[in-house]
């Protein structure tokens, strides 16, 4: 009998998975995952890879968030799972990149889309697990909310069921990484220095306090918050990226500069002085060129180390259109004039191009750059198939031998040109590349541009060319433009 009881407890003990913590972050495995997820009402899970640079950058901030929540006595837990070891779990939740964060509420997952610093993580979690705006009873509650994050927004209303209060709460519900507070108490009104109903944004930098003084609408308040939540000049980091690129302001003035440079402080001040004039219209961001991860951004703008420091402006509204200033000296006056000219629409987009190689047409696959693209691809007497690639792209490297063979196959056909262009160093005004490799067909006697969406094989490309761009074709640029216009003009009856 005793042996049976002992065996029962042994089996019971074996069935309970071991749950460990590292810096207050629960270490998840395939064995304990379901138990932990189902045993907590709220748990944020990071799916990571040990070799992932972004995961390494996130780790200390993630641990800080877990520790702070634990010290506050919160029921919200943070966990992490090594997706390279427990692949079946990450596959189940369709993890396609690292780090991927998901909040599990009573076992049901939702995507995390907040910032990567501990304040943003905590603010997002509290917003998702509690009221969209915290009720504030007195001045102490205001101070506590202000201390909880670098940026907070507080609204005072006589009646929290009023139209203005509802608008405030609707905006609060849509901004996950900023804590909001709301109150009807006179003590709160006095603490946030209001004479009547109103909204105030507090931040631990720049001017500290900004009062909303516009007509209250959802769009207006949201834009105002996004414009004022950032510093006059922000540094681009993995932590600030989601706020910078996810905000309402789509025009960004970028200063590429080394923080180790002796002229950094002066340049930052010149940049900051210019930023004051364009608050709410253009974001001013500096990119530290000493950071290895920022090399890809420099490459995107075609910048080399010997060109630094440098200013570039980008519009995210029009397929990430870039603008290059015509000045060399970085001063407040020059930056301001350039930015105003951009807003006035008098600055032409900057299109990158390498010089035309001497041997560009020596091999079966022709080499295109910005400077010879129109001449070759738009030749009305030729059917031209172009691969737009990036040197670092794995899929492009896999395609390379096939593309070379395709060039050889059609080398003697004077009506067909097989070409390629490095899109990290060359741009064409009306050809927008969103991913690599992208393959486009420029048919003879036509202004159409057709995307190739078929198999990336000799057979697939051959059939496409022999059917004059029909077999394996996606929508043409013209058809895509028409579809977009139809979508914009469509209204529900």
Swiss-Prot record:
Motif annotated as Prevents secretion from ER, chain positions: 490-493
Keyword line: Disulfide bond, Endoplasmic reticulum, Glycoprotein, Isomerase, Redox-active center, Repeat, Signal
Cystine crosslinks: 52-55, 393-396
Site keyed Contributes to redox potential value: positions: 53-54, 394-395
Site keyed Lowers pKa of C-terminal Cys of second active site: positions: 456
Deletion phenotype: RNAi-mediated knockdown causes embryonic lethality characterized by a retraction of the fully elongated embryo, a progressive disorganization of the embryo and a failure to hatch. Also causes increased expression of the unfolded protein response (UPR) marker hsp-4.
Role played: Involved in cuticle formation. May play a role in the unfolded protein response.
Residues annotated as domain Thioredoxin: 17-130, 342-470
UniProt cross-references to Pfam families, sorted A to Z: Thioredoxin, Thioredoxin_6
Signal peptide stretch: 1-16
EC assignment: 5.3.4.1
InterPro entries noted in UniProt: PDI_thioredoxin-like_dom (IPR005788), Prot_disulphide_isomerase (IPR005792), Thioredoxin-like_sf (IPR036249), Thioredoxin_CS (IPR017937), Thioredoxin_domain (IPR013766)
Residue numbers annotated as active site: 52 (nucleophile), 55 (nucleophile), 393 (nucleophile), 396 (nucleophile)
GO biological process: endoplasmic reticulum unfolded protein response; IRE1-mediated unfolded protein response; macromolecule modification; protein folding; response to endoplasmic reticulum stress
UniProt-recorded name of the protein: Protein disulfide-isomerase 2
MF terms (GO), sorted A to Z: protein disulfide isomerase activity; protein-glutamine gamma-glutamyltransferase activity
SUPFAM superfamilies found in the cross-reference section: Thioredoxin-like
Site (Lowers pKa of C-terminal Cys of first active site): 116
Region listing for Disordered, in residue ranges: 467-493
Record: glycosylation sites: 334
Major location category of this protein: endoplasmic reticulum
Family per record: Belongs to the protein disulfide isomerase family.
Catalytic activity: Catalyzes the rearrangement of -S-S- bonds in proteins
């Amino acid at each position: 009998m005793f042996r049976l009881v002992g065996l029962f407890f042994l089996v019971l003990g074996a069935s309970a998975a071991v749950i460990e913590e590292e810096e207050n972050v629960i270490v998840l495995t395939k064995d304990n995952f379901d138990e932990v997820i189902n045993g907590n009402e709220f748990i944020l899970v990071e799916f990571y890879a040990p070799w992932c640079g972004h995961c390494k950058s996130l780790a200390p901030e993630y641990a800080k968030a877990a520790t702070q929540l634990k010290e506050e006595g919160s029921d919200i837990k943070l966990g992490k799972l090594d997706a390279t070891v427990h692949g079946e779990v990450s596959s189940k939740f369709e993890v396609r990149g690292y780090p991927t964060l998901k909040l599990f509420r009573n076992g049901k997952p939702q995507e995390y889309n907040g910032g990567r610093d501990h304040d943003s993580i905590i603010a997002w979690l509290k917003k998702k697990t509690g009221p969209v705006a915290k009720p504030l009873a007195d001045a102490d509650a205001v101070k506590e909310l202000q201390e909880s994050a670098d940026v907070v927004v507080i609204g005072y209303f006589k009646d929290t069921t009023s139209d203005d209060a509802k608008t405030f709460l609707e905006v609060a519900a849509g901004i996950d990484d900023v804590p909001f507070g709301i109150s009807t108490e006179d003590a709160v009104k006095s603490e946030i220095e209001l004479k009547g109903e109103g909204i105030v944004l507090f931040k631990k930098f720049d001017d500290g306090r900004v009062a909303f003084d516009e007509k209250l609408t959802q769009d207006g308040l949201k834009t105002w918050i996004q414009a004022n939540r950032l510093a006059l000049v922000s540094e681009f980091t993995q932590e600030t990226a989601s706020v910078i690129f996810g905000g309402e302001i789509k025009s960004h003035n970028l200063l590429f500069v080394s923080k180790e440079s002796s002229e950094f402080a002066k340049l930052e001040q010149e940049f900051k002085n210019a930023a004051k004039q364009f608050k709410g219209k253009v974001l001013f961001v500096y990119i530290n060129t000493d950071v290895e991860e920022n090399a890809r951004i420099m490459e995107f703008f075609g910048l080399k180390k010997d060109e630094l420091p440098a200013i570039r402006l980008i519009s995210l509204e029009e397929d990430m259109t870039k603008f290059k200033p015509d000045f060399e000296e970085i001063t407040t006056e020059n930056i301001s004039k350039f930015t105003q000219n951009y807003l006035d629409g008098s600055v032409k987009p900057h299109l990158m191009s390498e010089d035309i190689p001497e041997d560009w047409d020596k091999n079966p696959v022709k080499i295109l750059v910005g400077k010879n693209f129109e001449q070759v691809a738009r030749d009305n007497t030729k059917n031209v198939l172009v691969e737009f690639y990036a040197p670092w792209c794995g899929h492009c490297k896999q395609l390379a031998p096939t593309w070379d063979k395709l060039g050889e196959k059609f080398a003697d056909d004077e009506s067909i040109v097989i070409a390629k262009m490095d899109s990290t160093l060359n741009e064409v005004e009306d050809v927008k590349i969103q991913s690599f490799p992208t393959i486009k067909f420029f048919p003879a006697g036509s202004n159409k541009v057709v995307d190739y969406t078929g198999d990336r094989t000799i057979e697939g490309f051959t059939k496409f060319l022999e059917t004059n761009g029909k077999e394996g074709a996606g929508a043409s640029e013209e058809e895509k433009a028409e579809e977009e216009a139809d979508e914009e003009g469509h209204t529900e009856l």
